[in-house]
């Protein structure tokens, strides 16, 4: 049965046509039983019903190609929050080990403004970079830490600059705006040591959303802006679901996809806040005056549409914003240190930060 997709904005701004209209076929499906031809129709409400055969692009690395062919178990009962957090902790340990081989560092646990932080100092830190700092807001669906190692270690290594990873309070125990408040508190404290034009704030997934939210909050509070923002795979709003969320899971085409119901996204994080609140959903904010921003996403990212939509909103607000899209790869693929594309993505992120900090 074809997958129901929400309509048509996906055709407007994205160059990767093969990825845009695709049925999610479970990984257990063999080539002999998978769909072999393209079919589609659009009903009177603009809902698309599609089946697509999507070959992997020829320039994908062998490592990335292998990573796409992963067995996904049948959909079982939802995992408990405790189990999810334990799994994320194990994943973080693997990220730490893999990336630390490529980017030697020292890691220290601390607190800043009463907020737990993890400070990653690259072995390549030079005297000229001691007056600069990068502030990371990790991914993890706002309820776990899925990436503070995979986001901070390579960026510290490739920039040669210390990273402060903020271990902000998590939902559902602490819904919005707790994470924003924690990040702003750490930023305020960093301003006592570092000039704002020597700070970059960045994050992936939930941390990318949080980066955009913090930028709006800093403007609202009249605090000085950092030198730059890095928004790597983000939602643009919480009151609606974008097209790519109706196509992909967090593993791209792999796994079971529940059709979006059109309601509030992530109610445990949103809590009692109006989902159109401009800090919570930055697409509704006045974005004028924000610093240069790099957006990064990928062709099979569930948050591809949200990232592209927010990038366009930044451009409409005359922000110096640029967007990089990696073909065919799933959500936050750059956590995987074994992929050449992950190293490339991390270098792109790091080079952008270095250019902005050099101004």
Task: For every predicted segment, state its role.
Residues 3, 62, 81-82:
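Short alpha-helical segments used as structural interaction elements across diverse proteins
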Residues 8-10, 69, 88:
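General helical structural elements
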Residues 9-19:
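Bacterial N-terminal signal peptides
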Residues 24-43, 51-77, 102-359:
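Alpha/beta-hydrolase superfamily serine-hydrolase fold, recognizing
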Residues 81-110:
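A domain-start/cap signature at the N-terminus of enzymes
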